[in-house]
Amino acid sequence: MAKGSKGLRASSKAVDPTLDALFASSAGPVQAPAKSKYSTLLDQKVREPAKPKVHLEEDDEVLSEISEELSFEEDGPSDEDEDEDEDEENSEQEDGSGDEQEEEESEDVDETMKDAPVELDDIIDATEDKSNKERKRKRKNDNDDLEGKYLDKVAAEEEADRAGKRQKNDALTKTEKPAVDEEDAGNESDIPVHETLVKDSKASDLDKAARTVFLANVSTEAISSKSAKKTLMAHLSSVLEKDATPPQTIESLRFRSVAFAGGSLPKRAAYITKSLMDSTTKSANAYVVYSTTAAARTAATKLNGTQVLDRHLRVDSVAHPSPTDHRRCVFVGNLGFVDDETVLNTNAEGDTTEKKKNKTPSDIEEGLWRTFSTQGKVENVRVVRDSKTRVGKGFAYVQFYDANDVEAALLLDGKKFPPMLPRKLRVTRAKDPRKTALAQERARGKHISTNGPKSTKYKHKATPEEQSMAGRTSKLLGRSAAVQQRHKKRPSAHGESREAEGQPAGIKGPEQFVFEGRRASARDGLPKDLKQKKGKGKKSGRPQNHGTKRASEWKKKKN
């Protein structure tokens, strides 16, 4: 053993003393780092603080592009990561085998020095790749399902809007039917409906007209005062039956023919501001719509001539108005144009003076009601006014229920009844409108041509012979005669027709009369038994014909 040990150990003389001093102070051969030292570095991950999530409100196209890029990045590194994991496992296995070899083979110093740096570089590369992978995965987590989050946010906002609309429409949905979508409504309108089920607008208008009542001489206080309007409504509903089925009520009340003060102001604005012109007239017209036709008929019969707000009401049905009978009417003229006839005079200096014709303003319509009611029961009073300004035209018509009351009303002619009727009345019988129309046509006929359609001059009536010849003249007398008879033109000697001369075609002049019989002569006055001596008349010459002319010419040539 001692000999063997001596043989293996180098002699002290063979070792260089300088090298011995160098290696004596060194730490020894380079050893591979332990596995546990780098495994701790791999396990420790650098955790960056999480970035705040930002809700990007971008278009759907931008979001889809981002999602495609993210998916592309996820697909790319995944294969590389798998390869890196395999490399790490292989490197770990190699490290384990390397440690065992280092313990067993400590003598191979050069090989370990070559292998150690290679293994260290692989481990460093693996840690860098893993850190990059973790960063990519963090980016992926931050932008994960970005488009879905955006759509969820939009859906939440729409749901909030719908909830707000539902809260607003809760009150309406309780009383009304649920709203129908536009598409459903359009589909329903396209569905054909039988003509018997379709509501006719004309029929509805006729039904409403049957339930409407016309009111005249309504006080304008009902327009300007709410209490006066309530009084009028109570009076109009006083004749309705409370226990009727269906119930009888007043649906609407509309005022018409109102004299407004503002000339340039629209009628609706003037009605809202209650700017009325009482100086023109204190009355207006109105229309009342009842719920049933029976209620309208009852109101028209019972309320006519009644008093409300110190005025007599004229009530008439719109669908079936009362007839106008001239035998029961009187014409009243010389009435005032406006109720308040105050005259304003302005001097040259600009001073304005008022001159009132009457201390108390007149009231024409109500005055006629009260004045003629003393002579009989008045059915209606119609004062003719201008449709726009409501200024009267100075006359009116008063109709009674009984025609005998007209005689008593005629006694009021030439009388005045202040303060409502301050002027003297001109009362006459009302004329038949048909006779008046005929008289107007006659007056117009004077200015119309003789053969005009409304001419009042004599027109020839065709005789039976002419009637029998009608239609056969062209066959019997020729086409020209038929044309003359059709146009009733008889040419005169001068070539002008009788119509052009101003005489009707059916009347003949004195020169056109022809009496049948022989022509009159001087012998008509002599007695028949008287014989007169016949004197020799002049001898008639030879006939002058073609033969005599030739003979005379031949004789002249011969001589």
From Swiss-Prot:
Record-annotated disulphide pairs: none
InterPro entries according to UniProt: Nucleotide-bd_a/b_plait_sf, RBD_domain_sf, RRM_dom
Nucleus as UniProt keyword: yes
Disordered as annotated region, ranges: 24-194, 429-559
GO process terms (BP): maturation of LSU-rRNA from tricistronic rRNA transcript (SSU-rRNA, 5.8S rRNA, LSU-rRNA)
Cross-referenced PROSITE patterns: RRM (PS50102)
Biased composition (Basic and acidic residues): 44-56, 141-180, 516-532, 550-559
Cell location: Nucleus, Nucleolus
Residue ranges occupied by any RRM domain in the UniProt entry: 211-320, 328-432
Gene3D superfamilies for the chain: 3.30.70.330
Alphabetical UniProt keywords: Nucleus, Repeat, Ribosome biogenesis, RNA-binding, rRNA processing
GO MF terms, alphabetically ordered: rRNA binding
Residue spans of biased composition, Acidic residues class: 57-110
Subcellular location, principal: nucleus
One GO CC term on file: nucleolus
Function according to Swiss-Prot or TrEMBL: Involved in pre-25S rRNA processing.
Family classification: Belongs to the RRM RBM34 family.
Protein name: Nucleolar protein 12
Record organism: Gibberella zeae (strain ATCC MYA-4620 / CBS 123657 / FGSC 9075 / NRRL 31084 / PH-1) (Wheat head blight fungus)
